[in-house]
UniProtKB/Swiss-Prot annotation:
Gene name in the database record: MC1R
Keywords from the UniProt entry: Cell membrane, G-protein coupled receptor, Glycoprotein, Lipoprotein, Membrane, Palmitate, Receptor, Transducer, Transmembrane, Transmembrane helix
A single BP term in Gene Ontology: adenylate cyclase-activating G protein-coupled receptor signaling pathway
Protein name: Melanocyte-stimulating hormone receptor
Membrane topology: Multi-pass membrane protein
Quaternary structure note: Interacts with MGRN1, but does not undergo MGRN1-mediated ubiquitination; this interaction competes with GNAS-binding and thus inhibits agonist-induced cAMP production. Interacts with OPN3; the interaction results in a decrease in MC1R-mediated cAMP signaling and ultimately a decrease in melanin production in melanocytes.
TM region(s), chain numbering: 38-63, 73-93, 119-140, 164-183, 192-211, 241-266, 280-300
Source species taxonomy: Eukaryota, Metazoa, Chordata, Craniata, Vertebrata
Name of a matching Pfam family: 7tm_1
Membrane topology (Cytoplasmic): 64-72, 141-163, 212-240, 301-317
Family: Belongs to the G-protein coupled receptor 1 family.
Single GO MF descriptor: melanocyte-stimulating hormone receptor activity
Species this chain originates from: Macaca nemestrina
Amino acid sequence: MPVQGSQRRLLGSLNSTPTATPHLGLAANQTGARCLEMSIPDGLFLSLGLVSLVENVLVVTAIAKNRNLHSPMYCFICCLALSDLLVSGSNMLETAVTLLLEAGALAARAAVVQQLDNVIDVITCSSMLSSLCFLGAIAVDRYISIFYALRYHSIVTLPRARRAIAAIWVASVLCSTLFIAYYDHAAVLLCLVVFFLAMLVLMAVLYVHMLARACQHAQGIARLHKRQRLAHQGFGLKGAATLTILLGIFFLCWGPFFLHLTLIVLCPQHPTCSCIFKNFNLFLTLIICNAIIDPLIYAFRSQELRRTLKEVLLCSW
């Protein structure tokens, strides 16, 4: 967290462009070429972070309160919410402290600021990695529940889920510490990109296979009841649309950030790449947006969780 300028060293010094006055327009890069630069107002960034924070706190609270939600599936959803909560909270904290330093409202020695920056960077990076891991874990859990339905409760037990969760958190913290320490090495950035692509491929393969199985099942039912063919076609279209939305949101929110990392390795000095680097804060904002959307996709669709959430909100009043 540099004392001057609101650039983030988080995932490091990945972006060397300080945040300018919020605008959307053409800006000149170092070579004189003109490119589109979109700076995100700090107020908007903090507001989105706050929405994500509240949403995910509600999810974690509801799952913790209701013992019926202490199954492996909801444990993964709870950990996803906790990861998204940390992503939003750490970015909000970094932005807020940076604004206070710039305004002169907060005085701190450079060494203290550097230590705080390192801690926030590790929290942010580890929560991003764990968020991706738990998205993959949820996909695997759903895949097993469909293809191994009869053996699901013997395969995905609560102790195994807890061990998997512990392994994900430990691995995320260790890897993020190494990534932050060696952020200026191309191999580190490539590892992050490969990890993202692996999660994308894993989710795509599992969800496409699940959709194919569901369509196959619906087709079998339609053969027994010929009148239901139109319903089967509608089911296939609805399933395809749901899958497209799920994977599309994942790619749209996370893809630009990892494209940014890829271009740092491939073309750090190219004018076109320099234009993309200027939108680093936009890419972070998209990740915050993903943290807002995740509860809507994975948590709030559960009737039991929504009922518990209503009880929590009513009790708070």
